[in-house]
């Protein structure tokens, strides 16, 4: 019987495989094998200034040296490719657009400098910084589209309901966590 277990290791090809990455790969591989699952290798090549194909090949060789094989990924393919993050950008853009279209996400135009200033002001007031202040959450969608079309930089943020109360998840190790 096939297992539903699917685990992924996504090293960044910005250098050689380091000990922490090797440990994570070994744990994921062992978990997949122990549960009859699938071990997926996906290359996280999203740092264009430091990622290289040569480093990706070095990582693949290191994983083979460790005795690790992968069921899906570079050189072996699979049903859920591509297996390099930069080749998946269209998939991510489609998913992000869907979230925005459904009202589950919104564009934020706050600059790094604005966010740093918010953090610094909270520190000066000795207030605990509560993170992003949702400044762009309720922007008119047409204004947001105009700003995007004008080439203004933005990120897409998840539109978490404001009246959600505590978010509680079940963690397999820690139980209920808020």
Predicted features along the sequence, with ranges:
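Active-site cores that bind ATP or allylic diphosphates and position pyrophosphate for catalysis
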Residues: 106-107, 111-178
């Amino acid at each position: 019987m096939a297992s539903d277990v699917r685990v992924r290791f996504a090293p960044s090809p910005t250098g050689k495989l380091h000990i922490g990455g090797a440990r994570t790969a070994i744990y994921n591989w062992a978990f997949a094998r122990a549960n009859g699952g699938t071990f997926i290798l996906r290359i996280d090549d999203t740092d264009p200034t430091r990622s290289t194909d040569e480093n990706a090949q070095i990582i693949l060789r290191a994983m083979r040296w460790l005795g690790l094989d992968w069921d899906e990924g570079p050189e072996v393919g699979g049903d859920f490719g591509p297996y390099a993050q930069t080749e998946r950008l269209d998939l991510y853009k489609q998913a992000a657009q869907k979230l925005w279209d459904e009202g589950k996400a919104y564009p934020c135009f706050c600059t790094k400098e604005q966010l740093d200033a918010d953090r610094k002001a909270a520190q000066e007031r000795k207030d605990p910084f509560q993170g992003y202040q949702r400044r762009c959450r309720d922007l008119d969608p047409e204004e947001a589209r105009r700003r995007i079309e004008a080439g203004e930089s933005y990120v897409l943020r998840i539109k978490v309901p404001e009246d959600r109360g505590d978010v509680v998840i079940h963690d397999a190790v820690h139980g209920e966590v808020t």
